[in-house]
């Protein structure tokens, strides 16, 4: 699908980024509900003023952004189609093993629907992209424009969302990354229900309680943690936690 950008906006810095076409960019996505819900990457539609989805038969439909989550790089769109749409099902990504065959679908370089095959090269791969640094590494060729496309197992179930590549040149070198379905399903469910993802947080910084600290505080047992900082306006501050408090359990 494609979206328009205003002239002053820049494209996302994530890889693979949407392939630019003047003031337009393109990416990939997939339908998860016959009513027209579409999953894609957050960086694909970030900054877009108008979003359009092109179906397999060439039908072009305007899309509404239901919600996006930059931390997981996932977004949920909604299109209104005159008929019920065929939808994909999520599979269990936790069953995938190194060497498991996979198929990646997408829209590389805006060329249109393309499929590539490969295997799971690694699981739990971290690439330093944010708090959810737990990717499926694949060798199926993916390129700019594949972002947001589905990664299938041999049963035709979506076990990942293609989201990034490692490449010094910007093109495919056989190292791609997909968000596992185990995470994507939870994020998408939150976006569908609330349009956003609410995350629990405490708002404190802690450090291990050392023997020396315990002795200076008059504590017999050094098992625990000491609060070194309480963030203003945080749940911890509202609960009355203070710097220097010792957490024992």
Where are each of the predicted segments found?
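Serine-dependent protease modules
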Residues: 1-239
């Amino acid at each position: 699908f494609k979206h328009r950008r205003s002239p002053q906006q820049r494209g996302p810095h994530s890889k693979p980024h949407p392939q630019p076409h003047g003031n337009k960019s393109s990416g990939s996505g997939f339908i998860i509900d016959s009513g027209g819900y579409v999953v894609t990457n957050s960086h694909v539609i970030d900054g877009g003023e108008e979003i359009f989805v092109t179906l397999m038969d060439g039908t072009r439909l305007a899309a509404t952004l239901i919600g996006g989550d930059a931390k997981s790089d996932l977004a949920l769109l909604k299109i209104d189609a005159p008929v019920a749409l065929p939808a994909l099902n999520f599979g269990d990504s936790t069953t995938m093993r190194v060497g498991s065959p996979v198929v990646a679908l997408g829209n590389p370089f805006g060329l249109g629907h393309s499929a590539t095959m490969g295997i799971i090269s690694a699981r739990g791969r971290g690439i330093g992209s944010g708090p959810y640094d737990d990717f499926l590494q694949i060798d199926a060729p993916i390129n700019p424009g594949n972002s947001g496309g589905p990664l299938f197992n041999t049963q035709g179930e979506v076990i990942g969302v293609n989201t990034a590549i490692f490449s010094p040149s910007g093109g495919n070198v056989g190292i791609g990354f997909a968000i596992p379905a185990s995470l994507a399903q939870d994020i998408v469910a939150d976006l569908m229900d609330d349009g956003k993802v609410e995350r629990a947080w405490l708002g404190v910084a802690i450090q291990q309680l050392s023997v020396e600290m315990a002795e200076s505080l008059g504590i017999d047992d050094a098992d625990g943690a000491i609060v070194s900082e309480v963030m203003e306006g945080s749940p911890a501050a509202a609960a009355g936690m203070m710097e220097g408090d010792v957490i024992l359990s």
